[in-house]
Swiss-Prot record:
Protein name: HTH-type transcriptional regulator BetI
Keyword DNA-binding appears in the UniProt entry: yes
Gene3D superfamilies: Tetracycline Repressor, domain 2 (1.10.357.10)
PANTHER family membership: HTH-TYPE TRANSCRIPTIONAL REGULATOR BETI (PTHR30055:SF234), HTH-TYPE TRANSCRIPTIONAL REGULATOR RUTR (PTHR30055)
SUPFAM superfamilies reported for this sequence: Homeodomain-like, Tetracyclin repressor-like, C-terminal domain
DNA-binding region(s) from the entry: 31-50
Species whose genome carries this gene: Escherichia coli O7:K1 (strain IAI39 / ExPEC)
Amino acid sequence: MPKLGMQSIRRRQLIDATLEAINEVGMHDATIAQIARRAGVSTGIISHYFRDKNGLLEATMRDITSQLRDAVLNRLHALPQGSAELRLQAIVGGNFDETQVSSAAMKAWLAFWASSMHQPMLYRLQQVSSRRLLSNLVSEFHRELPRQQAQEAGYGLAALIDGLWLRAALSGKPLDKPLAHSLTRHFITQHLPTD
């Protein structure tokens, strides 16, 4: 009989082991056996909880996207009466949170994006994440701009966030957070009306 609470502990162990494996050897070379060994479990446990490697990748990406959502929401909840500018900067901060810019997370995101082009479930997950970012940005810009301008500014800021993140991920170096925040802050202030 399984111990109570063991499922969530095992799932966490396996997701963490998946991130470690992707970080060290890449998604394609990370095997179920390697991931199980890192987690200290049998390969059968992975099959039991996730079916296969694709199920494990999906669960890992759901975990990372959940961390992204939490990072953004925690910052926004701290600014219930904040200006559009402050709330936009909070959204940027959530996207550049350590949970999203660690080496393991960046490599997992890259593997996820590549796999999402071929796997419908991962594609849907990627679309939800992308739409959420754009919707949050447009909503905040729309507090001070007409709808069309807010959509354009939101799209531009989303592209800047993704571009800065992607350049850092592909460089193999940590994201330069001060530079990323400076560039995004400049973009935000350029697009919001001045008092």
